[in-house]
Swiss-Prot record:
Species, as recorded: Levilactobacillus brevis (strain ATCC 367 / BCRC 12310 / CIP 105137 / JCM 1170 / LMG 11437 / NCIMB 947 / NCTC 947) (Lactobacillus brevis)
Cofactor: a divalent metal cation
Primary location recorded for the protein, binned into one broad class: cytoplasm
Domain of life, source organism: Bacteria
UniProt-recorded name of the protein: NAD kinase
Gene: nadK
The UniProt record lists the keyword Ribonucleoprotein: no
């Protein structure tokens, strides 16, 4: 089994990455950043998101595991003082894993050029550079609503605890193979109406968003921007691919939610 170490540039993360590399070498575990079986990220959830996009053409072959060197994250199960325990688990790896849904994003451009596709681990957002975004929202090719507001957020179950939650979306257990759409500051009055609540879309349905103005839109895939050509439409659905994590220890999803947003000391 080959391991890649993917670290952020923080001093504490670099120290952990160096200790991890030395420990894996001593344990006889090969280090290979080009063709790994397991990618170990050192940092936080942002570092793991970066690693996911770096290796998203190898999702059928690679598993991820995260060491967090800052605050507790949803994707990082190991603390910086548990490096040796993780090395022992990697050395005894037998392929154990857990997988989570991903989001497929297909972008059609107003100039008729070839559509782009991307994968998101957390979410995708569409907003205007400035002013109100106006867009028609279709569910399974049926017009659902005409949206006016700051933007829309479409998230995966694991991404439901990220930006989606901050704009009023529901927290969704990742065992649900579904995507969620949450409105960002929608305009609701006697003239303009939207549903005004999050939507949960099953795996056999899809969301299509058609901006009224194809120009000056900002489309994000996790923390990455998608090329800023005039957009005709964006289609979202559950991806065929899934992300796999090496499951050396199990942390219940709701335990992650509680520890990140509530805290036992407040109980």
């Amino acid at each position: 089994m080959k391991v890649s170490i993917f670290s952020n540039n923080g001093l504490s993360s670099q120290k952990v990455a160096t200790a991890l590399q030395k420990g894996l070498t001593a344990a006889g575990v090969p280090i290979d950043s080009l063709d790994p079986d397991v990618v170990v990220t050192v940092g936080g959830d942002g570092t793991l998101l970066s690693a996911f996009h770096h290796y998203n053409d190898r999702l059928d072959k690679v598993r991820f595991v995260g060491i967090h060197t800052g605050h507790l994250g949803f994707y990082t199960d190991w603390r910086d003082y548990e490096v040796q325990e993780l090395i022992d688990s990697l050395a005894q790896d037998n392929g154990q894993s857990v997988s989570y849904p991903l989001l497929t994003i297909q972008v059609e451009y107003a100039d008729g050029t070839h559509p782009d596709q991307a994968l998101a681990l957390n979410e995708s957002t569409i907003k205007k550079v400035s002013g109100t975004m106006v867009a028609d929202v279709y569910i399974k090719d049926e017009l659902f609503e005409s949206f006016r507001g700051d933007g829309l957020c479409i998230s995966t179950p694991t991404g439901s605890t990220a930006y989606n939650k901050s704009v009023g979306g529901a927290v969704l257990n990742p065992r649900f193979n579904a995507v969620q759409m949450a409105e960002i500051a929608s305009i609701n009055n006697l003239v303009f109406r939207t549903l005004g609540s999050p939507l949960i879309i099953p795996a056999d349905e899809w969301i299509r968003i058609e901006p009224a103005d194809p120009t000056d839109n900002v489309l994000m895939c996790d923390q990455l921007g998608i090329e800023g050509r005039p957009i005709k439409a964006i289609m979202y659905r559950i991806a065929r691919q899934r992300i796999a994590f090496a499951e050396y220890r199990h942390t219940h999803f709701w335990q992650r939610v509680e520890s990140s947003f509530i805290g036992r000391e407040n109980a």
